[in-house]
Each structure stands twice: as structure tokens, then as C-alpha cells.
Amino acid sequence: QNPLNFVNNFSDVNKELLSELKEEIKKGNYGEVQSIAKDVIDNEEKINCHGKRADSIVKGMLQHSRASSGQKELTDINALTDEYLRLAYHGLRAKDKSFNAEIKTEFDSSLGKINVVPQDIGRVILNLINNAFYAVGEKEKENLNAYQPTVIVRTKRNNGKVEISVIDNGNGIPDSIREKIFQPFFTTKPTGQGTGLGLSLAYDIVKAHGGEVKVQSKEGEGSEFIVQLPVNA
């Protein structure tokens, strides 16, 4: 959901609670006053949290609008994918020194160059790889025996299209939410950790290139996101 809806809803609730608070103070019901005050504080924390999420969404959208030149150019997809894979890994390691995963690359050397907006497709790759790292990192926290976090990044040519696949052996995506993952503001991450715009923007970017994003997932075993781009865009 749009985090501003939460901000508005909790603000409305607090207005009512504060009216009740005034009445209870007049009556001298200080036990009830304490209870209402606690509810108001709890709601303020939620407002603060969702407000920060809204802020990060706006910043992300502004960053995206500034970063994209909109100019397509012949781009080496293997080199671009490798560059953003390294960026994702080192960016995460800078924030979390304990993160570790086996990373495998399977690049099709015959891929050649295709016409894309490199910053935009790079943003898509970065988002998918960050999501894969998050998925395996969360599964590793479960301390399962012999679990080895693994992310595979693969490129290949398939039926006149270039495919970029990001595969993880995390917990997969439940069937109940698979249809929602490309919706704006939808996120499975804890409040404050995800904007819910990453996959939505990725979907729009790929669609603007005449391509599509597909997902295959098995709950408990992992997910594969496949970006398909036309060779002659």
C-alpha cells in the first residue's frame, strides 16, 4: 500500500484519540489517560516509520528520473550485468560485513551488443540482484544445516531475445503474493526496509524497452527472475 495512506489513517485515529484524551482529563480518569497516551505514541511511531518510507520512495523516484538519459546505445549486456553484480555485492558488503554468498556467473559469450538505455537496465539488474541477496541472507538467518546461500546470474540468447536471469536459493515467493510483486508499493520486507517500488520500476523499464520480466519460484527452494529484451530494440 501507499505509505501515505498509513500516515493519513494513523493521523485521523490520533485526532480522535486526542479528543478522547481531553475528555478523560476533564473527568480525572488518569488510568484511561495513560492508556490513550500510549496508543497515541504507538501511532506516532507508525506515522514516523511510514513517513520515512514515503521519503525514501520519493528520493528513489527523483534519483531514477535524474539518472536516466533516456538514450539507447549499443551495450555489452555481459559487461553491464557483471558491473552491476559487483556493485550490488560490494554495496551490500559495505553495509553488512557478515554477508557472504556463493556467486556464480554463466554469461553467454556470443551475446554481442544490443540497444538499451544502460543506466536503466543496470538499475533493473541491480534491483534483482539486491533482492536475491536479501532472499538468501534471510534464509541463512534460519540457521539451516548445510545451507549455502547461492546466487546465479546468467545471460543467454533465446528465440531472438536476450535473457538476463537472476536465480537464488532463498525461501521463494508464496503463491498467494506472486501476482502482487510488480505492483507499486508492494513489499515483503519489514516496514522501513523496502519501498515497494523496485520491482515495479524494473517492470516498467523493461516494458519500455519492448521486453518483459518473468518470475519462476518454488516456496522453500528459491526464485528465478528472467528479463527478456528484444535484440533489435
Feature roles, as predicted:
Residues 142-164:
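Short beta-strand-loop-beta element adjacent to the nucleotide/active-site pocket used for signaling
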Residues 37-44, 71-86, 104:
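A conserved beta-strand-to-alpha-helix junction within the catalytic ATP-binding
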Residues 77, 172-180, 194:
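Short helix N-cap motif at coil->helix boundaries in the Bergerat
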Residues 98-112:
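Conserved catalytic submotifs in the C-terminal HATPase_c
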Residues 2-52, 58, 68-72, 92-99, ...:
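Histidine phosphotransfer helical core of two-component systems
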Residues 7, 198-202:
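Short alpha-helical Gxxx[C/S/T] motif in the catalytic ATP-binding
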